[in-house]
From Swiss-Prot:
5-phospho-alpha-D-ribose 1-diphosphate binds at R37, G38, R69, D88, D89, L90, V91, D92, T93, G94, G95, T96. This is Xanthine-guanine phosphoribosyltransferase. Belongs to the purine/pyrimidine phosphoribosyltransferase family. XGPT subfamily. GO terms for biological process: GMP salvage; IMP salvage; purine ribonucleoside salvage; XMP salvage. It is an enzyme of class 2 (transferase). Its EC number is 2.4.2.-, 2.4.2.22.
C-alpha cells in the first residue's frame, strides 16, 4: 500500500450517521450483524443511531495488522440474514465480502469505506477509497505528542 488514509473518531461518527440515515426507517430491521473486528465500532454506532438493540457478530479473520491472509470463520450469527444489516468498516479486495454474502445471502450488507475491487459486493457504503490506500482506523491509533518542526 502506497498511501495512507487516516480516519478520526469525528469522521467515523459523521460517516456512520450518514449511513444510518440511508437505512431508515429502522423498524424494517430485525438487528445488526457486525463483522469482527472492523465492523464492531461502526456496528455500535449504527445500533445507537437506529435504536437497534439486537446486535450479533460474525467473526472472520483475514488481516494480521497490515497483512492480508486466508479467511478463517471463528463464529457466525444464525440464519440467512433476512431483515439484518451486516456492517463492516471496509470492503477491500472482496474476500471477506464474498464469504459474508455466502453466509447471509438475504442480509443488507453495508460498509463505511469501499475500495473499487470490493464495491460491487456491498449494498451501500459512504466513502470511496483508492485500491492502493491503507486505512488507519481510529481504534488502531493513539494520540501522541508531535514536537514542532523547528524544535522550539
Amino acid at each position: 500500500m502506497s498511501e495512507k488514509y487516516i480516519v478520526t473518531w469525528d469522521m467515523l461518527q459523521i460517516h456512520a450517521r450518514k449511513l444510518a440515515s440511508r437505512l431508515m426507517p429502522s423498524e424494517q430491521w430485525k438487528g445488526i450483524i457486525a463483522v469482527s473486528r472492523g465492523g464492531l465500532v461502526p456496528g455500535a454506532l449504527l445500533a445507537r443511531e437506529l435504536g437497534i438493540r439486537h446486535v450479533d457478530t460474525v467473526c472472520i479473520s483475514s488481516y494480521d495488522h497490515d497483512n492480508q491472509r486466508e479467511l478463517k470463520v471463528l463464529k457466525c450469527a444464525e440464519g440467512d440474514g433476512e431483515g439484518f444489516i451486516v456492517i463492516d468498516d471496509l470492503v477491500d479486495t472482496g474476500g471477506t465480502a464474498v464469504a459474508i454474502r455466502e453466509m447471509y445471502p438475504k442480509a443488507h450488507f453495508v460498509t463505511i469505506f469501499a475500495k473499487p475491487a470490493g464495491r460491487p459486493l456491498v449494498d451501500d457504503y459512504v466513502v470511496d477509497i483508492p485500491q492502493d490506500t491503507w486505512i488507519e482506523q481510529p481504534w488502531d491509533m493513539g494520540v501522541v505528542f508531535v514536537p514542532p518542526i523547528s524544535g522550539r
